[in-house]
Amino acid sequence: AQAVSSLFAQKGLWIKEPKLLVQTLRLELLVTAIQFTFYVALLRNIKLEHMAITRYFDWFLTTPMMLVSMSSYFLYKKGERSAGEIAKKYKSQFVRILLSNLAMLLAGYLGEIGVIPKMSAVVIGTAAFIITFRIIYKDMGGAGNNIFKLISLVWGLYGVAYVLPESEKNVMYNALDVISKNFFAIFLVREISKTNIE
């Protein structure tokens, strides 16, 4: 799925405008490349009981990029056109989004390795997730956007997977990773192509 979506998404890179969406697509393709590399390593070297813990090394890299790219898309739909202007204008929001995402991941990781109880990790992680997506909804153009609703649902399901037994958890994580990390890149290509047709 990663290879197919990457090949499809690369066609969007040949289009130069709208620049902000093309830059966002490049970030999503980097996410897909990291995911692909991680899964190759995961399948070759890592035992089932260590898979969930190891995923966090992927997520610590990819989720900040995914949050920046989805926020950039929503801001584009609000009328923003410059990545540089977005970085200046929404610096505070981006910092808060990335910090709350970090808190969510740290809680999950510490719960997985047994430093804190798993249910405590669920509570902390859920609170951090709500904070993250509330900022995107309220300040970054997520309100009223159907893609925001879909992404929120998919990300929320990671919390459901977290409490499942190892085998079921990793199957669900695999499915959610494919959706969350590949769907948006394909969607961006569609948006870029549609904009150029118009």
Residue ranges and their predicted role:
Residues 1-58, 63-198:
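Polytopic alpha-helical membrane-helix bundles and their juxtamembrane interface segments
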